Amino acid sequence: MKFELDTTDGRARRGRLVFDRGVVETPCFMPVGTYGTVKGMTPEEVEATGAQIILGNTFHLWLRPGQEIMKLHGDLHDFMQWKGPILTDSGGFQVFSLGDIRKITEQGVHFRNPINGDPIFLDPEKSMEIQYDLGSDIVMIFDECTPYPADWDYAKRSMEMSLRWAKRSRERFDSLGNKNALFGIIQGSVYEDLRDISVKGLVDIGFDGYAVGGLAVGEPKADMHRILEHVCPQIPADKPRYLMGVGKPEDLVEGVRRGIDMFDCVMPTRNARNGHLFVTDGVVKIRNAKYKSDTGPLDPECDCYTCRNYSRAYLHHLDRCNEILGARLNTIHNLRYYQRLMAGLRKAIEEGKLESFVTDFYQRQGREVPPLNVD
């Protein structure tokens, strides 16, 4: 993988990730394909929304179908028939989400398989091996996603262990002869001094890109913005920056304003299945009775398959009848909305008009522009 940086507007960056499998224009949003599928969508439909890279989930694919089944097909690209690049998370977030059924040690994490209750152990080395078998174009180190809230002492211990695990991840990745990209993950909760230590430690080890982890886990938005404003300038300018698990459309806008290049989140697909649809002027909750006789398109400014062909009344009808097609059409629209948003941000950065784009984005939704505390 090669990262090319074209231009900046304030702290926002316009560039691209170049892979053997294709080029990804940045800033970018990566749809989440947890089990080797973006829920309800064929790879061709995902690509048609404008997505150039997707995310797969190491933890879930390790449990089902497992490494051996994956290797029978070649790798994850062959298994799911996605032709473009794939980023896989390390499994750390899912393991730490298991709560009481897991035990963290210096060596790794002991837990019970949530499917059948069998005892399982996952460590940095195993995570690198699974992601190698998946053929991931971007591999994420194995780390502990520090929960929120966490006091300073806990956050410090967690961050320091994640640094040690980052070194082990790097060593196993290299010993496997993996020619793809490996990203480090910056931790430290909401504490700037801990984030400083994490960034420096990861840069000293050396990675192909750097993710900001441990945000969007319940902390106030002001804390997320503050940490991004503090951390992003410390990440080497020639490396891509990835904000993990984020987020709402406004979170993508605010991340880009602060220098983030890559995002992923289940929100557009999950919300689509619940009838919560993103449009230029805000949100449409399609199961609301007021849409029963609305013959207009979901979003008049959207060019997706759903908006070009179907009315709000039809989408409302499908939702009320729990029809699978409704979830699919909603997902197509939400994913296209996110890709159109990212394309708009990229164009605005190219033209040096980002703040004008941001102002218009919020005004269309009747909201104030959040403050930006950068030099």
Swiss-Prot record:
Reactions accelerated catalytically: 7-aminomethyl-7-carbaguanine + guanosine(34) in tRNA = 7-aminomethyl-7-carbaguanosine(34) in tRNA + guanine
Organism superkingdom: Bacteria
Positions bound to substrate: 89-93, 143, 187, 214
Recorded GO MF terms: tRNA-guanosine(34) queuine transglycosylase activity; zinc ion binding
Keywords per UniProt: Glycosyltransferase, Metal-binding, Queuosine biosynthesis, Transferase, tRNA processing, Zinc
Annotated function: Catalyzes the base-exchange of a guanine (G) residue with the queuine precursor 7-aminomethyl-7-deazaguanine (PreQ1) at position 34 (anticodon wobble position) in tRNAs with GU(N) anticodons (tRNA-Asp, -Asn, -His and -Tyr). Catalysis occurs through a double-displacement mechanism. The nucleophile active site attacks the C1' of nucleotide 34 to detach the guanine base from the RNA, forming a covalent enzyme-RNA intermediate. The proton acceptor active site deprotonates the incoming PreQ1, allowing a nucleophilic attack on the C1' of the ribose to form the product.
Protein name: Queuine tRNA-ribosyltransferase
GO biological process: queuosine biosynthetic process; tRNA wobble guanine modification; tRNA-guanine transglycosylation
Textual note on the cofactor: Binds 1 zinc ion per subunit.
A single GO cellular-component term on record: cytosol
Stated consequence of mutating residue 264 to E: Reduces catalytic activity by 88%
Quaternary organization: Homodimer. Within each dimer, one monomer is responsible for RNA recognition and catalysis, while the other monomer binds to the replacement base PreQ1.
Result, substituting residue 265 to A: Significant loss of activity
Binding site for Zn(2+): 302, 304, 307, 333
Species name: Escherichia coli (strain K12)
Top class in the EC scheme: transferase
Gene3D superfamilies according to UniProt: Queuine tRNA-ribosyltransferase-like
Coiled-coil ranges (or none): none
